[in-house]
Amino acid sequence: MPARYAVYYAPSAGDALHQAVTPLLGRDALGGLNVPQATPPGVDPVFWKAVTRVPAHYGLHATLKAPFELRHSGMDSQLLRSTGEVASRFLPFAIPSLSLAYQGKEEKGFYALVPSTKCSLLSFLERACVMDLDAFRAPLKTEDVARRGHLSLEERSNLYMWGYHRVLDSFQFHITLTDGIADA
């Protein structure tokens, strides 16, 4: 299977967000290590482990450019350089406070941390990552498209154009905390 690349936001190890959420997921994404998984107060530990299986695999992050295969092998150093160029166009900025929110459809949504107020800089950064790095992305395979299931016209257009359905105007910054579960 060819390597896949993505651009993620991940807070530094000393950041309060990293220190608070990493134990809840049981994985340190920065170090690539499993850590003892903590359970939120009042939540059954068996239930928590079950509903965090997928996010725990990846650790604390938010996607800015969804995973993709390279258009041509050997482009990884160019991709890294171009990603650095995109990042260099942005001064460091703070993400607004985060709130816990239920995302998606009732029967298959998930809980995530989302900005409590709109952050245009996040949208601009995501847009730059999606558009400026897309030349490195290999075309989608039939199974990639099929895996997405039913999409709106805009989502399907985004999928074919940019390799992912929730980008640009459909983008919402989020840090996934659970697998798909029915809204409680």
Residue positions per predicted region:
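Basic, often amphipathic N-terminal segments
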Residues: M1-P96, L100-K105, F124-A184
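Positively charged, aromatic-accented nucleic-acid-binding surfaces
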Residues: P115-C119, S123-R127
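Short, conserved secondary-structure transition motifs
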Residues: A101-T117
